A protein has these predicted regions:
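Structural alpha-helical scaffold elements that stabilize or flank donor/cofactor-binding regions
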Residues: 37-38, 151-153
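Structural motif
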Residues: 44, 88, 157-158
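Short, charged/polar "capping" segments at the starts of alpha-helices
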Residues: 1, 23-26, 52-57, 75-77, ...
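Active-site and donor-binding regions of nucleotide-sugar-utilizing enzymes
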Residues: 1-71, 166-168
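Acidic donor-binding loop of glycosyltransferase active sites
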Residues: 154-162
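C-terminal alpha-helical cap of glycosyltransferases
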Residues: 222, 236-252
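Conserved catalytic-core segment of nucleotide-activated headgroup transferases in glycan assembly
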Residues: 66-135
Length: 252
């Protein structure tokens, strides 16, 4: 329909809106030179934050990219740090059954878990935990939690996850420390791609590194935590644009 409007109604404003974060696995979301040349794209594409503007032009510098409101992340933008958190470690599972199983397996191999510490699991709404692993096969110190992810993240110290999931990125800006078992080679590039502060996450290539990272963040020095949270807040404004009446008007 972009081709039709731009060919037969060239004076009509056509806009696109990409209201999500980015992953290297989704390179197909970056418009190409051919799409630009043949006018199958909107005249202007809006992203949800300043950090995405250059990324979106990876395959075509001629694109007209602007920043619009981060509608989906409105609550995250207004979030203020909550000191009291009741969950030490939460595993965030996604729609990939194999990846989710590996996240659970990696956790069970850590000394921290073997000592009997509680670990909470938040499964994806479309893939119940029962579809990944039978309840009787789960160690007793795994506890499933349900509810809005934002409320869980606000009460969590460490999030462990992998694969394509906006929840992992959101966790950073709810001031959780994020641990990423290296189950996908793209994992180590996604956060670099978005320029996420290095202090807020660790890539763990084995259970020993995962164990050490858990202990590091649970015993994080106050000064280090303060610096980490400050950097998160500074970067959040580049990742997610505030919703205002002015930027909502782009849709009118």
């Amino acid at each position: 329909w972009n081709f039709g409007f731009r060919t037969y109604y060239p004076k009509i404003l056509s806009i696109g809106y990409q209201g999500y974060t980015l992953y290297r696995q989704f390179m197909c979301k970056h418009p190409s030179k051919a799409e630009y040349t043949y006018k199958v794209l909107p005249k202007t594409i809006f992203t949800i934050g300043e950090v995405y503007k250059k990324i979106r032009k990876e395959f075509c510098n001629n694109l007209k990219i602007k920043v619009g409101p981060a509608l989906r992340f409105k609550n995250l933008i207004s979030y203020k740090y909550a000191k009291q958190r009741k969950y030490n470690v939460v595993l965030i599972l996604n729609l990939d059954k194999d990846v989710s199983s590996e996240i659970i397996e990696n956790m069970t191999e850590t000394e921290w878990f073997k000592s009997g510490k509680k670990v909470y699991i938040k499964s994806h709404p479309l893939l119940p935990l029962s579809k990944i692993m039978k309840k009787e096969n789960l160690p007793k110190n795994f506890l499933e939690i349900r509810g809005e992810f934002s409320q869980i993240a606000k009460n969590t110290k460490i999030v462990i996850g992998s694969g394509i999931s906006s929840s992992i990125v959101e966790s950073i800006f709810y001031d959780c420390a994020v641990l990423l078992p290296l189950l996908d080679k793209n994992e180590q590039y996604n956060f670099k791609y978005l320029k996420i502060p290095k202090e807020s996450y660790k890539i763990c290539i084995n259970s020993n590194q995962l164990n050490n990272a858990i202990n590091y963040y649970l015993n994080e020095k106050k000064l280090n935590k303060k610096k980490r949270i400050k950097k998160n807040n500074l970067h959040k404004s580049k990742m997610f644009e505030k919703v205002t009446q002015q930027n909502l008007n782009i849709f009118l």
